[in-house]
Amino acid sequence: MIAYLGNWQACPTPDQYAEYTHIVIAFAVSYTWSPSKNNCDSQCNIGSPVPICNNQNRQDLVDLWRSQGKKVIVSFGGAGMGGSWAGDNNDCWEYCFGKEASVVSQLDAIVRAQNFDGVDIDYEYFYNDGDAFSLPGSTGAKARYFLDTVTRDLKATLPAGQNLITHAPMEPDSEKGTEYYDILKANAANLDFLMPQYYNGWTRPALDGLTGTGAGSKAALPHYNDLVYDMFGGDATKVVFGFCISDCSGTGTNANAVQASAVMTELGGYHSCNGGAFFWVVNHDYGGAWSGPVGDAAGVGGSNCDA
């Protein structure tokens, strides 16, 4: 059970994080927030130390969670760095293109200083040739080189035992046939797991189940199976199914505990030993009322993976 913790939101309580196996700190960014358009750092300087929760660096919580056996991962990116959807004008990712070595060095320093277990790349921006980039000289090729190089070099640079690497792509971006899919597949050996967002895209598993359509235009299971079989050679433990609790009403993709539990139970019928679930966001997991039942359905603790 992997939980995204919005680091501007309240710090979680023990009854919230009891079920979590991983906590992803969202987000490390290279901007300062502004309501109309975020103020990008032109040199892609990443804010440090990265806040943990309540806009504060709570090293005590990171150390506590790790002492309990949880993995604490810092996520670089998020929607505020730039989104590929209509109406979004943030473009901070573009200032990072060509600065791969600096990005890797900065994230390595952050991981070491704050005792994180690794890095998540949360990239929801453009990567195709001909996409609507903002800055002169920005291209799909530069975006793809950035994603590939940062992924590869982080795995090689982060210290042993603190070098978990993952991505959390939007579901259409991780669809077989896209350039992003190809980058992820080429880096399969560098990815400890992948967290596709089944709430930002074509599928509506909370309403349609894994194999149906209706609310969504595509079914989730074929997408998931491509990741399992084509990208990760049949290892379903590498693919973590993504949910949004209540921030995604605009796309009709919220999943309550009953709906998400049903999806995970259904997924267990196809892949008895899978990568479990992740969700956005801790602030909406009131008292663990979402993560508790969904974790039970997902078999958190590995009960479904026993030989």
Short names for language-model regions:
Residues 1-261, 271-272, 287-296, 300-301:
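Chitinase-like catalytic core of GlcNAc-active glycosidases
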Residues 264-267:
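Conserved short secondary-structure transition element at the edge of the structured enzyme core
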Residues 281:
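Residues that scaffold, gate, or flank divalent-cation-dependent active/transport sites
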Residues 284:
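Short, flexible active-site recognition loops that position polar ligands and cofactors
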Residues 306-307:
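Extracellular/luminal ectodomains of metazoan preproproteins built from arrays
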